[in-house]
Design a protein with these regions (language model features):
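N-terminal non-catalytic cap/leader segment that marks the start of a structured domain
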Residues: 1-90, 256, 273-277, 282-286
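A generic local secondary-structure boundary/capping motif
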Residues: 4, 58-60, 81-83, 107-116, ...
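Short, structured patches in soluble enzyme cores that scaffold and shape functional sites
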Residues: 7, 95, 111, 120-122, ...
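Short Gly/aromatic-enriched secondary-structure transition segments
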Residues: 21, 85-89, 134-146
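Catalytic-pocket segment enriched in acidic/His residues
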Residues: 51, 78, 154-286
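Residue-level recognition of short, solvent-exposed, well-ordered loop/turn junctions
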Residues: 63, 117-119, 226, 250-251
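Structural signature of FAD isoalloxazine-binding scaffolds in flavoprotein oxidoreductases
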Residues: 86-103, 118, 250-260
Length: 286
């Protein structure tokens, strides 16, 4: 089964089950709300209003996760290209919901950074509440998977040993296009990242040092994971910063991220209009 969150013309969002080119409303405002209501199984039989998905405006599949936990250095080839040893434990950092954008939304390029890199990733979406999960509990807690690109401001990331400040910029991180349950994803699924059509990353998603179950177990030891929480599992080799010479994303370029069985993100990078943001802030304070 595949689920998506649609933006409708009247400003509201709805969760839909994807039936071919049609989205069937499940009775929830978004996929996160569906999961929090325990509606994953019921979504398979939902028979609500129908929407044509051709050209539909897709929101982040989970628009406002309670937690977004990201994993660094989790693909063997990426660890080696960055000159590091395989880790004993996962490296964790976080994002806020304000970082997330939809699968066709524009990536905002801030004027404060000129070293903006791509990091295609598999995202895990949690479906049930777990704490200190066993392997079986961790597997059962996974509602499904999405595509994510952890677009990174490298010049900010390396200002300190903590990566967070390069990873959490607003309107930088596409996620979607759907939540796909595990049965939708082939065992040999590949993650591919392209910039303006040029292939830059291609890796089997099972090349993870710590797989999805490992991560749910480890993270749930630290704190409770709840329905709708997102875990970004890390990026494979092929990032721009590790290339000789280094390469980065510029305004006007199109970043495409694909995982077999889940779908594709297509996001154009645009220069952030700081004047517009400032004006909005002034209006809110008036």
């Amino acid at each position: 089964m595949k689920l998506a969150t649609l933006r409708l013309s009247e400003g509201r969002t709805v969760a839909v089950r994807v039936d071919g080119e049609t989205g069937v409303e499940t009775g929830h405002t978004d996929v996160g709300a569906l999961l929090r209501a325990g509606g994953l199984e019921a979504a398979a039989a939902a028979d609500g209003a129908r929407h044509d998905l051709a050209g539909a405006d897709l929101a982040p599949v989970v628009p406002a996760p309670g937690k977004i936990v990201c994993v660094g250095l989790n693909y063997r080839n990426h660890i080696l290209e960055m000159g590091r040893e395989l880790p004993e434990y996962p490296t964790l950092f976080t994002k806020f919901p304000e970082a997330l954008i939809g699968p066709r939304d524009e990536i905002q390029i801030p004027p404060e950074s000129d070293k903006i890199d791509w990091e295609g990733e598999l995202a895990v979406v949690v479906g049930t509440t777990v704490r200190r999960a066993s392997a079986a509990e961790a597997e059962a807690a996974i509602a499904g998977y999405a595509v994510l690109n952890d677009v990174t401001m490298r010049d900010w990331q390396y200002r300190s040993p903590q990566w967070f400040q390069g990873k959490a910029w607003e309107n930088s991180t596409p996620i979607g296009p759907v939540l796909a349950t595990a049965d939708e994803i082939p065992g040999d699924a590949q993650m591919v990242t392209r910039l303006d059509g040029e292939e830059l990353q291609r890796t089997p998603i099972d090349d993870l040092v710590f797989n999805a179950v490992d991560l749910v177990r480890y993270i749930s030891t630290i704190f409770t994971l709840n329905p709708g929480d997102v875990i970004a599992t890390g990026t494979p080799g092929g990032v721009g910063h590790a290339r000789k010479p280094a390469r980065y994303i510029s305004a006007g370029q199109t970043l495409t991220t694909t995982i077999d069985g889940i779908g594709e993100l297509v996001n154009v990078a645009v220069a952030e209009r700081v004047d517009a943001v400032a004006a909005a802030g002034e209006a809110a304070r008036a």
